Swiss-Prot record:
Keywords from the named record: Selenium, Transferase
Stated name of the protein: tRNA 2-selenouridine synthase
Gene: selU
GO biological process: tRNA wobble uridine modification
Assembly and oligomerization: Monomer.
SMART domains listed in its UniProt record: RHOD
EC number(s) on file: 2.9.1.3
PANTHER family: TRNA 2-SELENOURIDINE SYNTHASE
UniProt function note: Involved in the post-transcriptional modification of the uridine at the wobble position (U34) of tRNA(Lys), tRNA(Glu) and tRNA(Gln). Catalyzes the conversion of 2-thiouridine (S2U-RNA) to 2-selenouridine (Se2U-RNA). Acts in a two-step process involving geranylation of 2-thiouridine (S2U) to S-geranyl-2-thiouridine (geS2U) and subsequent selenation of the latter derivative to 2-selenouridine (Se2U) in the tRNA chain.
Organism name: Shewanella sp. (strain MR-4)
Length: 384
């Protein structure tokens, strides 16, 4: 058998190219975390893996290998091979990987060669690639300056970031809009998958000629997705650009995000009746998540207004009353909290302005700092 191995030096290229990957680990391993371009076509399913693992602990490697062959043979073995071949027919450039790039990868490669197809497997497997991506995140703040985009809730930071080539949308990667009402209909990624996606986004960003990495000023937790500690710490010391927006535009934007888009999404997913029920639950549960911070009296006031707005929406198909609780939530909760947090970083603020003014400022910042960083005389002075 000819062993074809993809060395660890090619991890960068694998992730930047989005190379199709066959993950040979059991589903329980895959579900904890994998890579965006991977598909789970396991050599052994969960129960088979568990039996082999127990055998390995009690009787050693050779006995475990023998048990694995007895569990995956005949029709079962052929089904696994057929699944790999079907994927490879659509993705002939794919690579294999298991947990460490060991027996599972080698055995699968052998079976595929016997079926007439040679497929490389990745050195180090999942563990090696995962450690590489963790290193990418840890190194990122030292490679270029971080710039933090701040702004009150509803100021349109996410839409702004999507128009900037030097930006990475952390909330998009986390599939959560960051606030207590930021939950989306689809679930968030696992913590491992969030980190893997962030690392790959950083690799793509580093390919561009950007003077900085622009990120939204986030909390440590984006929903349930935790920013890696070293990366979050670097964000806390970054210079800040503050996006300013009129209150009426903020209210209209939040009405669209919290009410119109979420209502429409739930109905498309669940139908009219169940969709509205799920939408109502989303709003009331989101409000309930900040009950302690609001205090009993303010929470009850907001809940009453929200329930009235839901009733009006259900019976009259009108959403204007939602503006009442959104306005109260902004002015009594989000805005004071935002001002308090921003005041602690006031010394880091470089610029404040509207969407247009901030775009213009960032264009100038990008141009000036790019030329400075690529000036050979400046580089020479910085060295000595």
């Amino acid at each position: 058998m000819t062993t074809k191995l993809i060395p660890a030096q090619q991890y960068h290229d694998i992730f930047v190219a989005g190379k199709p990957l066959i993950d040979l680990r059991a589903p329980i391993e895959f579900d904890r975390g994998a890579f965006p371009s991977s598909v789970n076509l396991p050599l052994m399913v969960d129960k088979e893996r568990e039996k082999v693992g127990t055998c390995y602990k009690e009787q050693g490697q050779q006995a475990a290998i023998a048990l694995g062959h007895s569990l995956v043979h005949g029709v079962v073995k052929q089904q696994r091979i057929d699944a790999w071949l079907n994927f490879l027919s659509a993705h002939p450039q794919a690579y294999l990987y298991c947990f460490r790039g060991g027996l599972r990868s080698q055995l699968t490669q052998q079976w595929l060669q016997e079926a007439g197809v040679t497929v490389p497997y990745v050195q180090g497997g999942y563990k090696g690639m995962r450690q590489y991506l963790i290193g990418v995140i840890e190194a990122a703040p030292s490679l270029q300056p971080l710039l933090s985009l701040s702004g009150m809730t509803g100021s349109g930071k996410t839409d702004f970031l999507k128009r900037r080539k030097e930006a990475i949308d952390l909330e998009g990667i986390a599939n959560h809009r960051g606030s207590s009402f930021g939950k989306n209909i689809d679930p968030q990624p696992t913590q491992i998958n969030f980190e893997n996606r962030l690392a790959i986004a950083l690799l793509h960003h580093q390919l561009g000629n950007h003077a900085c990495l622009l990120l939204e000023d986030e909390s440590f937790l984006i929903g349930r997705s935790a920013l890696p500690q070293s990366f979050y710490s670097a964000m806390q010391t970054a210079d800040i650009v503050v996006l300013e927006e009129d209150d009426d535009i903020r209210l209209t934007r939040l009405l669209d995000e919290y009410v119109h888009k979420m209502h429409r999404g739930f109905i498309e997913r669940l139908g009219l009746e169940a969709g509205f029920e799920a939408f109502s639950h989303y709003l009331l549960q989101s409000l309930g998540s900040i009950r302690k911070r609001l205090g009993g009296k303010q929470y009850q006031e907001l809940q009453d207004i929200m329930q009235q707005a839901l009733s009006q929406q259900l019976n009259q198909n009108q959403t204007s009353q939602h503006l009442a609780w959104i306005s109260l939530l902004l002015h009594k909760y989000y805005d004071p909290m935002y001002e308090y947090q921003l005041q602690k970083k006031a010394g880091n603020i470089l610029f404040r302005g509207s969407h247009q003014a901030t775009h213009e400022w960032l264009d100038n910042y990008q141009r000036d700092n790019y030329h400075r960083n690529n000036d050979p005389l400046n580089s020479q002075h910085s060295k000595g």
